[in-house]
Amino acid sequence: MKLSDLRPNPGANKRRKRVGRGPGSGHGKTATRGHKGQKSRSGGLKDPRRFEGGRSTTLMRLPKRGMQGQVPGEIKRPRYQGVNLKDLARFEGEVTPELLVRAGLLKKGYRLKILGEGEAKPLKVVAHAFSKSALEKLKAAGGEPVLLEA
């Protein structure tokens, strides 16, 4: 047996339907789209997830909720990312947000919040925020929480 003898199983490769290629193809002229109407045109249908035949859509009938965004620009709020105490167990000495970014535990541009899942080690932890449980566990283990000013 040679590589050139290999063939796919019968029926495994279905041929692509080529439409609009003349009457002999069986899919010429209207190219399987039928006659006239919106669905036969290029651009086709309106989005069926939103368009309801011209009546007031469900989305438009529901009330607006929350903030709709500001005209000059979006209000930028600081984004926090939580890191659990159990994830800090592999570090020694001082733990900073920069160190956690390099270690892949904190996304760049996010503020660091230490959460209390897991056991604490006696570390100096520098963060933007601490949960109550994380603060208690860290102090009980002899660690030093340092709050960063934002």
Curated annotation (Swiss-Prot):
It holds the Pfam family Ribosomal_L27A. Residues 44-53 have a biased composition (Basic and acidic residues). The keyword Ribosomal protein applies. InterPro entries: Ribosomal_uL15, Ribosomal_uL15/eL18, Ribosomal_uL15/eL18_sf, Ribosomal_uL15_bac-type, Ribosomal_uL15_CS. It comes from the Bacteria. Part of the 50S ribosomal subunit. This is Large ribosomal subunit protein uL15. It comes from Thermus thermophilus (strain ATCC BAA-163 / DSM 7039 / HB27).
